[in-house]
């Protein structure tokens, strides 16, 4: 299964080595010194009982990573407009997108059946960029139950 982690910081950097260790074909969208370190030495996850190193394909350009079976977005909320603008090359018509991040999801009221059914949240998706680029029908929320930090570029 091809899985791309969009945002290889503390959360994405924790998930990528674990998914690769489980047999997934993992790639990451990263930037700066973190990207350079991942491209050179792989992405290292330091756990209390072991160290996992994932030699993942890493790029700042999602177009270099190809279509994916699943995408996990693990960025901070202010980076979501950038995700909306750049995620298209990763998506097939049926690619699910999991949001592993803090806060209320931008698609929260989509098809919930309650009094706010279908209501959009302009503070979270001001120009409907995520709504149009990804769509609520393929969006999933995720919970990451671990404490993570980037120790140094390429190491979580």
Per-region residue spans from a language model:
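A contiguous, well-structured "functional interface" segment within a domain
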Residues: 2-6, 14-18, 141-156
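Short, hinge-like loop/turn segments at secondary-structure boundaries
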Residues: 44-47, 114-117, 156
């Amino acid at each position: 299964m091809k899985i791309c982690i969009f945002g290889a910081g503390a959360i994405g950097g924790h998930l990528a080595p674990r998914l690769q260790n489980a047999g997934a074909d993992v790639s990451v969208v990263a930037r700066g010194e973190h990207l350079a370190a991942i491209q050179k030495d792989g992405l290292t996850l330091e756990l209390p009982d072991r160290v996992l190193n994932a030699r993942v394909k890493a790029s700042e350009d999602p177009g270099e990573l190809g279509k994916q079976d699943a995408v996990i977005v693990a960025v901070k909320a202010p980076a979501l407009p950038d995700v909306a603008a750049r995620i298209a090359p990763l998506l097939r018509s049926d690619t699910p997108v999991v949001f592993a991040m803090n806060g209320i999801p931008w698609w929260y009221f989509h098809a919930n059946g309650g009094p706010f059914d279908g209501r959009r949240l302009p503070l979270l998706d001001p120009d409907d960029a995520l709504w149009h680029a990804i769509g609520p029908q393929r969006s999933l929320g995720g919970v990451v139950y671990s404490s993570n930090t980037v120790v140094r570029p390429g190491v979580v």
